[in-house]
């Protein structure tokens, strides 16, 4: 089990900087490019802070960090016509992104991301029935996948991007749920390949997308119809608030963890979320458990890199030898076997 860190806004030791659209425009009107200069300085501050957090994770024995959702304020606002490649300080920003990637690989700290536009309460999403919302979502997903590329990471699930289905229905029939999964897939394939190869879906806390439905439609159904094997990310708090039941019996936490873990490629450690003070359940397969921290403090001592056995060379070797096709074929074979012999919900997670 690997401990993963999510920093909350309440953390007094961490202060990421943002910039409102109103303030940006005020600065631009006061002096040409002043708003852009201010924005650039705040992005640079956020990236330096991110690098410091990753170093601190290494010293605290934390092997994973979910990137702060607002590292790049306003860059997703199309009306401002801002571009990462041309913004003031672009070269410094690029170098800092490379530094973050190097620091994470040096200390064997993996990274993930959950875009702010795709939080659980967002009205946007890949399955939206509003094309403008889909365009907005695709733009943001492409941007954050590009950040991982600039950091030097392979385009795979070892640096995952987490989203929710977002589109829900009160009439959770097979037809309606399949329709949402189809729309999600259609939106997803509008993204760059570097998004598709990183995208994972999480169970929701108060919609039709509990663990069971997510597995059946986003993993099994999507794999069978669209030939895309979607990894699923488990959230224990959402599961507790929105449980699954099969034949009148509640599906247990252990069953959900086991099922979701098996949706990930064999050579990638699944990234799940554990949202209470108790320790996550132990599991035969290594799992990264993200957890919010309000009291995370930076150590004063210099971080000592981990041994060479766990640093960049191993990462490179993993990238070169990654062959997802056999795993995909194996899972598809299993899915097709179940589809032929079962009706919806007539089995427990493909068994």
Language model regions located:
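Alpha/beta catalytic barrel-like cores
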Residues: 1-110, 119-142, 146-157, 180, ...
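Residue-level marker for buried hydrophobic side chains located in beta-strands
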Residues: 111, 232-235
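Conserved, mostly hydrophobic/aromatic
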Residues: 114
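Glycine-rich phosphate-binding "P-loop"
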Residues: 160-177
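Short, catalytically relevant binding-site loops at active-site mouths
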Residues: 168-170, 205-208, 238-241, 279
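Conserved His + Asp/Glu catalytic blocks
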Residues: 233, 240-241, 269
